[in-house]
Amino acid sequence: LYTFCKKIKYQEKKAVDNVSFEVRRGEAVALFGKNGAGKSTILKMITGVCFPTKGKIEVEGRVSALLELTSGFDPEFTGRQNIFLKGQLLGLKDSEIKELEQTIIDFAEIEEYIDQPVRTYSSGMKARLGFSINVNIRPEILIVDEALSVGDEEFKNKCTKKVNEIVNKDEVTLLFVTHSTALAKEFCSRGIVMQKGKLTFDGEIDEAIKRYKKTVKK
C-alpha cells in the first residue's frame, strides 16, 4: 500500500492519514487500534468498498473479506444458490464452486436449511454461511475484521482453527483486525498500530501488542 489517506469531508477529518505499508505474500499481519483509529476504513479501501482521497492501493490476488458476513446475500435465493452467487462474485467458475459446495455447507452446519430462502435464516445462520463461503473459496488474501465471534463457543473455536489452518498450510496472506491480542499473537508475526488515523508502529508482534496496550490505557 502506497501512502494514502481518506478524508471524511463533512467534518474535514482524515479517517486515514498518510498511511503506507506493504504486506507480502504469505505474511500474517495484525492491525491494532482503538475504535475510530482507521482500521476498518483501511480494510474497506483494500476491498474496494471505498477509495482513498489521495494515494493508491495495489492488491495482487483473490481477496476474501470477513467484514460484514451477512451482506451480499440475495434474500430470495436459497442458501445453495447464494453459495454460487457469492462464489461467482469472488471470481470462481461454477465447476470450482460445485467442488467446494458440500465443504461450505458442512462447515456452516446448515445442511437441513440449505435449500430454503436465506430470508428465512436467523442472523447467526447467515453469518455462519457467510464465514464458511469466505474461508473455503481458497482465498489468496484473507481479511478478517473481528469475524471470529460467529455463533456459540464451539463454532468460534472451529472458526479460529480454520483461519489458523489456511494461514499456516495454504500460505494465505492474512490482514487481521482484532482487539484480542492473544488471537493476534496466535496468527500473526507482525503488527501494525493505528492511532487517530495515523500509523504509529509497524513491526514485531510482541512490540506491537505493547504499543497497542499503551494506546488503550490513554
List where the protein language model places each region:
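Pre-NBD coupling/linker segments of ABC/ABC-like ATPases
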Residues: 1-15, 205-217
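A short, surface-exposed alpha-helical micro-motif characterized by mixed small hydrophobic
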Residues: 184-186
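Conserved ABC ATPase "signature" C-loop
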Residues: 196-197, 212
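H-loop/switch region of ABC-family ATPase nucleotide-binding domains
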Residues: 178-179
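Conserved ABC ATPase "signature" region
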Residues: 1-3, 84, 96-113
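The feature captures the beta-strand-to-loop junction immediately N-terminal to the Walker
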Residues: 32-34
